[in-house]
Curated annotation (Swiss-Prot):
Protein's name in the database: NADH-ubiquinone oxidoreductase chain 6
Source taxonomy: Eukaryota, Metazoa, Chordata, Craniata, Vertebrata
Keyword Mitochondrion part of the UniProt annotation: yes
GO molecular function: NADH dehydrogenase (ubiquinone) activity
Enzyme category, top tier: translocase
Catalytic activity: a ubiquinone + NADH + 5 H(+)(in) = a ubiquinol + NAD(+) + 4 H(+)(out)
PANTHER family assigned: NADH UBIQUINONE OXIDOREDUCTASE SUBUNIT ND6 (PTHR11435), NADH-UBIQUINONE OXIDOREDUCTASE CHAIN 6 (PTHR11435:SF1)
């Protein structure tokens, strides 16, 4: 199980690197899917099933739609591939930043921040992420609606920014 969790963590980091150093929007979608599946699998292996399911639906249901619209509106006739030197340079730079962060984090990692587990150290019979469902639908409904409208506004802003002056792949008939 330990090797599986380490493998999911490695896939999550590689997916994040793929999104950050994507040569074109076509390949950014692949990195996003890899990172979201690995991250949600990681949370699922830690026992946080509800949060994992919600994040999986948000990432693949919301962000993937924005990527699809971006790809359809910004068709690139000659997309860069993963092997181009500019993309490899970005990837190497991100790996260097990651290694420096791990080295610096190793010195800070000895501090105790008081993190508790999902069942609050066995104190409750109901896990904390399942009790969050009731709070989400009772007290958090207003913020949920505000977040939905914000995501819709973000979708239109991204569509307008991607379209620009050239109208992308959609042409006037």
């Amino acid at each position: 199980m330990t090797y599986f969790v380490l493998f999911l963590g490695l896939c999550f980091v590689l997916g994040g690197l793929a999104v950050a150093s994507n040569p074109s929007p076509y390949y950014g979608v692949v990195g996003l899917v890899l990172a979201s599946v690995a991250g949600c699998g990681w949370l699922l292996s830690l026992g946080v099933s509800f949060v994992s399911l919600v994040l999986f639906m948000v990432y693949l249901g919301g962000m993937l739609v924005v990527f699809v619209y971006s790809v359809s509106l910004a068709a690139d006739p000659f997309p860069e591939a993963w092997g181009d030197w500019g993309v490899v340079g970005y990837g190497v730079g991100f790996v260097v930043v990651l290694v420096v962060g791990l080295v610096v984090g190793g010195f800070v990692g000895d501090l105790d921040f008081g993190v508790v587990t999902v069942d609050s150290v066995g104190m409750f019979s109901v896990r904390l992420d399942f009790s969050g469902v009731a709070m989400f639908y009772s007290c958090g409904v207003g913020m949920f609606l505000v977040a939905g409208w914000g995501l819709l506004l973000t979708l239109f802003v991204v569509l307008e920014l991607v379209r620009g002056l050239s109208r992308g792949a959609i042409r006037a008939v």
